[in-house]
Each structure stands twice: as C-alpha cells, then as structure tokens.
Regions:
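DNA-recognition alpha helix
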Residues: 48-62
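Basic amphipathic alpha-helical segments that dock to polyanions
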Residues: 69-79
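Short alpha-helical segments that sit at the start of domains
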Residues: 4-37
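Short capping segments at the starts of secondary-structure elements
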Residues: 29-31, 43-48
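Short amphipathic alpha-helical elements of helix-turn-helix/winged-helix folds
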Residues: 21, 38-43, 55
C-alpha cells in the first residue's frame, strides 16, 4: 500500500474538516447540509439517501425528502466529503476529506461492513490497464466483495 500522510477525522473533527473543505470551495455549510453530514457520519455502514433522509427527519422532527438529500450528497461527493459505494447505491463519509485518493472499498457480503482503503499502486495499475485498452479512468472506483474478519470468525 502506498504511504502518504493524511489526517483521519472522526466526531467533531470530521464535521469541522468537512465544513472547512466545503467552505474553502466556496460553498455554504448550511443547517441542512450539516444535518445530512451528521446523519451520514453516524452510520457505521453505507447509507442510502432514504436512510439519511429518515435520520434527518427524525432529528429535525419534520419530513425531509430524499431528493433533497441526493442533491446534498452529490455536492458532498464532488467536494470529497463523501464517497459513493456504487454497488449498494449508498454513501459513506470520507474520513480524510483533504486527501484525494481513488476509492477502494472492501464490502462484506454478510454484514454489509464497508472499509475504504487507499492503495495508490493498485488504482494506478487499474488506470494503466485502462489506458492500454484505450480507456480513460481518471478516478477509478474499485469494490471488492467478500467476508470481513468478524464474519469470518462466526
């Protein structure tokens, strides 16, 4: 795995890093965006827009539409605050929003746990293979399905 320095955030540190990243890109950190980010970060597995809309609705005591959440999630993905797990049509908060790396997800088929790893040599190999096939893949997404260590023990 390629070595690189980046700060992993969680809790308030993650929320602060996300807010700072978004505002540095000229976007506003609104109450709704903060609520969506809080809900997204609270999930320990990838969450769909519907899951997030339900969590925000409960927290705010009013219905929040999933299409509003989708728009915010698209903004978050573009700003590197969230990653989309393509095969699950779900999202995870990016624990290091100031670092740009390709998405490599390890997804447990049994419990749904999803781990994001960085391996620049692996994603670089995918990019090179794509290029040799005449295909451009500037930011490949790699999803590996299998069984996590906890489920493997069971």
């Amino acid at each position: 795995m390629a070595r690189h320095d980046h700060q992993l955030h969680e809790g308030e540190s993650l929320k602060t890093a996300a807010r700072d990243r978004l505002t540095q890109q000229g976007e506003q950190w609104t109450e709704m965006r903060a609520s969506v980010f809080d809900a997204l970060a609270s999930f320990d597995k990838p969450a769909s827009a519907y899951d997030i809309a339900e969590a925000v609705s409960k927290a705010q005591g009013r219905r929040v539409a999933a299409n509003s959440v989708y728009r915010i999630l698209d903004l978050f993905v573009g700003a590197n605050l969230a990653r989309r797990v393509e095969s699950a049509n779900a999202y995870v908060a990016n624990a290091h929003p100031d670092c740009l790396h390709d998405c490599i997800f390890l997804i447990c088929d049994q419990c749904g746990q999803t781990v994001h790893i960085d391996d620049d040599s692996l994603s670089g190999g995918v990019r090179r293979a794509a290029k040799s096939a005449g295909f451009s893949a500037p930011r490949p997404v790699i999803e590996v399905r299998g069984t996590c260590g906890d489920c493997e023990k069971d």
